């Protein structure tokens, strides 16, 4: 496994632990479909939360938040629709971002974007 994949895996694990400490429940990790991949799918009460995890060592090029481009948001929303279509019920959902800095500080942005 490459160093980048290891860092990504570590960041996702850190994000999972953080969100579980906030009382969210892990439903799925690294959900893949033809539309893309969702890092974490969590449940917060009756809401399904699709989480994009980003880690940036430095703030060049705008930091972690800037890396969630409109194109990436579109892929995430399409993958989320695919996931929800498999469910028997119509759950409310939201898109969150977990941003992890080089010093491992976590920023949790709830409702980071909408389905637009």
From Swiss-Prot:
SUPFAM superfamilies found in the cross-reference section: Restriction endonuclease-like
MF terms (GO), sorted A to Z: nucleic acid binding
Gene3D superfamilies according to UniProt: 3.40.1350.10
Domain of life: Bacteria
Signal sequence segment: none
Family recorded in the similarity comment: Belongs to the UPF0102 family.
PANTHER family referenced in this protein's UniProt entry, alphabetically: UPF0102 PROTEIN YRAN (PTHR34039:SF1)
UniProt-recorded name of the protein: UPF0102 protein Neut_1662
Annotated organism of origin: Nitrosomonas eutropha (strain DSM 101675 / C91 / Nm57)
